[in-house]
Amino acid sequence: MAFQKRGGRRRRKVDYIAANHIEYIDYKDTELLKRFISERGKILPRRVSGTSAKNQRRLTIAIKRARIMGLLPFVAED
């Protein structure tokens, strides 16, 4: 029997930061940063969040700064 391919076209993810014209990712803007953190407290990868490489680097730096300053948790509370 022949196997049939499943699936269709996947929708291309949009860079939220570029789409909303955010030029500076501030570590104090926790509401923005929480969009890119999983429920376990880990930083979402580019393939999941859809951010560009440049914005992913900026985002990672901002999240790490916010964690050190105590604005975001390092791990999620259970």
Curated annotation (Swiss-Prot):
Keywords: Ribonucleoprotein, Ribosomal protein, RNA-binding, rRNA-binding. The keyword Ribonucleoprotein applies. One of its GO terms (molecular function) is small ribosomal subunit rRNA binding. One of its GO terms (biological process) is translation. It comes from the Bacteria. GO terms for cellular component: cytosolic small ribosomal subunit. Disulfide bonds: none annotated. The keyword rRNA-binding applies. Pfam families: Ribosomal_S18 (PF01084). Binds as a heterodimer with protein bS6 to the central domain of the 16S rRNA, where it helps stabilize the platform of the 30S subunit. PANTHER family: 30S RIBOSOMAL PROTEIN S18, SMALL RIBOSOMAL SUBUNIT PROTEIN BS18M. Part of the 30S ribosomal subunit. Forms a tight heterodimer with protein bS6. Belongs to the bacterial ribosomal protein bS18 family. HAMAP family: Ribosomal_bS18. This is Small ribosomal subunit protein bS18. It comes from Pediococcus pentosaceus (strain ATCC 25745 / CCUG 21536 / LMG 10740 / 183-1w).
